[in-house]
Amino acid sequence: MLIHPNFDPIAIHLGPLAVRWYGLMYLVAFIAAIVVGRLRLRLPYVAAQGWTVKDIDDMLFYGVLGTILGGRLGYVLFYKASFYFAHPLDIFKVWEGGMSFHGGFLGVTLAMVLFAYQRKRSWLQVTDFVAPMVPTGLAAGRLGNFINGELWGRVTDPSSPWAMLFPGAAPDDAAWLTAHPQLAAQWHLNEVFAQYHMLPRHPSELYEIALEGVALFFVLIFFSRKPKPMGAISAVFLIGYGLARFTVEFAREPDDFLGLLAMGLSMGQWLSLPMILVGIGLLVWSYRRARHEPAQAVSVN
């Protein structure tokens, strides 16, 4: 079994100031997006759209605002609405944690709509350009989660080579043993708990880095290396992220204040299903439009 390194959440101490790893990952995500965006400017069809370095900088400014505002509001509405409605001032305590990818996605989408309107560009042309820049940021965010030892996975067989002990999960592990006696006996988890006072879990943050970050990045980079019908790159992102998140959620521990919802699915899975369906619909629409209106549909217009 592996043991979580239990990193110090503070990455850098600057006198009275403390820079946390998770905050540092936002900076890493921002820089990575700039690098990927500038590399994409070298593609002939992207250059033909008239994108500039200033466009990337301005777009990321909108994107950061959309991510923070949407991510926070999404967490408030999707995950802990009753608590925040009772304590509305706590909504502004972002330093205490609580961000939602799906909320951040909606926030970024609205931000890109505004950016497209101001630049008089097609909204889908903007999202097609942005989509390959996103996975590196997702990977950085999940790395921040792993360093913090949070958002760990579900309990698993200790014989699994990837099973990991998370100290932060220890307070919940005794209750898990009581609630799942048969599985505990099958996996000999009582013995493990007696020795470590913790239970082995999936390092689901690392799974998300691999699928939502690395794999999705290469899929989008490969798919977008040549011109595609407008909306197709955005569609592949929606489908790819939705499938990756839906899959990883089977190994990720559900939020304790929500648990599993209808059909035994988590909130993350229910929020990912619409992304997959919309992505499939958008992909079909974009290729049909390209076939019937080739002069208007290709992403280089």
Curated annotation (Swiss-Prot):
User: Does the UniProt entry include the keyword Transmembrane?
Assistant: yes
Residue ranges annotated as transmembrane are: 17-37, 59-79, 97-117, 230-250, 265-285
Q: Which GO terms describe its cellular component?
A: plasma membrane
Gene Ontology terms: biological process: lipoprotein biosynthetic process
Q: Which PROSITE patterns does UniProt cross-reference here? A: LGT
**Which keywords does this chain's UniProt record carry?**
Cell inner membrane, Cell membrane, Membrane, Transferase, Transmembrane, Transmembrane helix
Membrane topology (UniProt): Multi-pass membrane protein
Q: Which InterPro entries match?
A: Lgt
Q: What class of enzyme is it?
A: transferase
Q: Name the source's superkingdom.
A: Bacteria
- The UniProt record lists the EC number as 2.5.1.145
Q: Where does a 1,2-diacyl-sn-glycero-3-phospho-(1'-sn-glycerol) bind?
A: 142
Cross-referenced NCBIfam families: lgt
The Swiss-Prot or TrEMBL record describes its family as follows: Belongs to the Lgt family.
| Protein name listed in UniProt | Phosphatidylglycerol--prolipoprotein diacylglyceryl transferase
